Every structure is written in C-alpha cells, then in structure tokens.
C-alpha cells in the first residue's frame, strides 16, 4: 500500500525508513543541490543517489563492526557531509558532527575537538581524503586523533551498497550526539534519537506551515543544530528540494543568500539575527533591484537574540523586493530539545499592556506539543519612556 507522507511521523519511526521510502517512490527527485561559491550549481543528490551513497558508507561502517559506536564527522561545506551523516544512520552508528580542525591556527579548534573526543570516545572518523591528508600533521599535537580509524568517504565506491544490511534501528536508537559550543564550560553532548528528529521535524512543519512544494535555501553550517535540522533533516522529512551554499560564501557577499532565494523561488530560509542585519547593511540599492523575494514565506530568525529593530529594518529595506514582514518567524531553540522549542509568524501586528504591580508574578507559558516542562519562566520588565521590554529566563 502506498503511504501518505503528508505527515511522515504517522507512517515511519526512523529517518532511515523515510529516506528508503523516498528512494523507492521518488527516485529521481533532486533533494540537495550544492552552490559551490554560493552562486554556481555544483553537485546534486537525488533520493536514489543519496540512498546509494548512504548504503555504501553504511556497509563500510558495518564491515568494521561500528554499529552502536560513535563516529566523528569532519567535513567542509558540501554534499559529502550529508552522505556521511545518512551513512551513519544506515549503519546504526551515532554521528558526532564537528567543524574540521583549523590547520592554520590549530590552537583555536584543537582544545574543543580533544575535549569532545575524550567525552564521546569515538572509534571512527569520517572525512574527505583532502582533510585526512592535511590533518595527519596534527597527530603529534593530539595523539588521540591517531588512535581512531579514519575513513575518507569520498573514496567509497557505489558497489558497496549491495553489501549493506538493514541495522533494524528504532525510534529510540540514538542518531546523533550534538555538542554544545563549550564557550562557558566543557562541551556537552546532547543525545538525539531518530524519534527526537521526527517529532521535532513534525513540530517545525506545523509551526512553519510547510508543504511538499516548499523550497529551502540555506547557508548554515551542517554541524550546527539549526543547519542540520532545517537544512538537511527537513528536506528529506518533507520531501522538498534544498539548495546549500558554504557559510563563507554568504559572509563574504550576503547578496548571494538573497539571490539564491530569488533565483530558486525559495519559500523557507533563515538564520541568526546577524544575518538579516548583515544583508541590510551590505546589500546596495542597485543589488536590491535585481531581487524578487515574493516567494519567501518563512524567514526564521533564531540561534541568538532576536531583535525587533533588525526585522523592521530588513522588512523596510527589502519591501521593494517583495519581502513581506509576515514572513518573519522569530523562534527559540536549543540542542537539548533537538532544535525548535517555540516560534511563530508575525502575521498580525500585536501590542501588549502590562500592569507593573503584577509583573513580579510568575508568567504562564504554553509549551509546544509533546514538550515536558522541567521548570518555569519569570517575566521581568522595567518601566521606561520608550516601548521596550526585557525578559529574563530563570531556572529554579
């Protein structure tokens, strides 16, 4: 019987099941296209090609009896990471995505990398042949790197796909260890299961009102929870195309992000608050004349403090390009909740009035579906002559 994938969480319990189904039912549909410099189209992956690569990498991992083990994923921006990530899932291996070491200034990235290796105890490193050859010079500075098995997945042949065996993972099987930044303490690994990914993906689809016809453009790094879930998991979950560009391509020329949205008629794209501020400051009036942002339905803003002034400036600046303020979806998320915790659109102008004497009472918050409350929030505000509200999240 043909499955109805309007809501995949009803039909499937793992990401492996979803991708396998799409490879059978939508074999030639392109799911990922890589924009090499943020502009020119490079490689792409159909569901069949992604499934084949995932089975090949999965079979290689199975040959080393890595099922249940942790694997570091050290990749540059590109499609190799996506194939390796799903390859881990196909082998029952827990993926641990991290940015590759900074070879020019190893002291900037090695401490965090070594701390995570010590905590996660990975047995395998998946990477590209280029990164492998360049990283060998760091083995003397970090001996633990040499103790792991390094596999260059860009050398894996498609013939291995025939040797793959279904790992029989379930919704409770761990898919990922998502590590925190480690800016204030040692990085901590958040355990995320297949079920966690599916439930959060279903919630994202409800909050953003996504449909299979939605089109994604992203420049967010895949090792970040927002980039991984919105840029890689969501396209497979909902069966929609995604166009990816290197983060550095956006940072060097922010216009590339909006040009891609305009060119591919993207309906969903976003990033941290600074990305919108960067576009407002760096994109010229002449460049704006070439943009059509009327297709952009969901412009999510999260991963750092969301500033109303930034959104107002962006909306005003790009109104002539067809951008609608109602497209903004401010959101709050964290790795401990897979990604999205709360969010919504700005479809209606809203205002609030407060009685100052009541602001010291605990505010009442409604959690997202299937979210377990572990504490509460307190709202704190200070009277001032300009419309301004500060909020403090306090754990007790």
Task: Mark where each language-model region is.
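Conserved AMP-binding/adenylation subdomain of ANL enzymes
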Residues: 198-215, 222-267, 282-287
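AMP-dependent adenylate-forming
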Residues: 18-45, 174-177, 184, 333
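Conserved AMP-binding/adenylate-forming core of the ANL superfamily
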Residues: 32-69, 73-86, 103-114, 158, ...
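Structural core segment of the AMP-binding/adenylate-forming
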Residues: 90-161, 272-273, 278
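A short helix-loop-beta submotif of the ANL/AMP-binding
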Residues: 78-103, 115-124, 214-215, 233-243, ...
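Adenylate-forming
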Residues: 124-134, 151-156, 249, 264-316, ...
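Conserved AMP-binding/adenylate-forming
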Residues: 297-299, 306-331, 335-396
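Conserved pre-ATP/AMP-binding loop-to-beta segment of ANL
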Residues: 27-30, 150-151, 158-179, 185-186, ...
């Amino acid at each position: 019987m043909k499955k109805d994938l309007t809501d995949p969480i009803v039909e499937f319990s793992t990401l492996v099941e979803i991708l396998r189904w799409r490879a059978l039912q939508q074999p030639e549909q392109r799911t990922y296209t890589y924009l090499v410099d943020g502009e020119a189209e490079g490689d792409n992956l159909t569901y069949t090609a992604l499934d084949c690569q995932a089975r090949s990498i999965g079979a290689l991992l199975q040959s080393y009896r890595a099922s249940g083990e942790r694997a570091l994923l050290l990749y540059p921006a590109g499609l190799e990471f996506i194939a390796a990530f799903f390859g881990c899932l196909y082998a029952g291996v827990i993926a641990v995505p991290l940015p590759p070491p900074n070879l020019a200034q190893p002291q900037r990235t090695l401490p965090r990398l070594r701390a995570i290796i010590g905590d996660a105890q990975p047995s395998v490193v998946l990477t590209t042949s280029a990164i492998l050859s360049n990283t060998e010079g760091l083995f003397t500075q970090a001996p633990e790197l040499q103790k792991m098995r390094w596999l260059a997945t860009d050398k894996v042949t498609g013939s291995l796909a025939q040797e793959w065996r279904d790992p029989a993972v379930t919704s409770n099987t761990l898919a990922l260890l998502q590590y925190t930044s480690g800016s204030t303490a040692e990085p901590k690994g958040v355990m995320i299961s297949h079920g966690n990914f599916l439930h959060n993906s279903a919630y994202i689809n409800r909050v953003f009102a996504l449909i299979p016809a939605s089109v994604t453009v992203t420049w967010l790094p895949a090792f970040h929870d927002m980039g991984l879930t919105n840029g890689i998991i969501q396209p497979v979950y909902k069966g929609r195309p995604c166009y990816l560009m290197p983060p550095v391509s956006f940072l060097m020329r922010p216009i590339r992000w909006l040009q891609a949205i305009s060119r591919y008629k993207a309906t969903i794209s976003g990033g941290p608050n600074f990305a919108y501020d960067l576009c407002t400051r760096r994109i010229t009036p002449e460049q704006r004349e070439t943009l059509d942002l009327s297709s952009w339905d969901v412009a999510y803003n999260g991963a750092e403090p969301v500033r109303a002034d930034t959104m107002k400036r962006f909306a005003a600046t790009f109104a002539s390009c067809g951008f609608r303020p109602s497209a903004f979806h401010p959101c709050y998320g964290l790795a401990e909740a897979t990604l999205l915790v709360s969010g919504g659109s700005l479809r209606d102008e809203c205002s609030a009035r407060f009685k100052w004497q009541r602001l010291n009472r605990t505010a009442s918050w409604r959690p997202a579906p299937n979210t377990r409350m572990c504490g509460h929030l307190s709202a704190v505000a200070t009277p001032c002559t300009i419309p301004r509200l500060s909020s403090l999240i306090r754990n007790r």
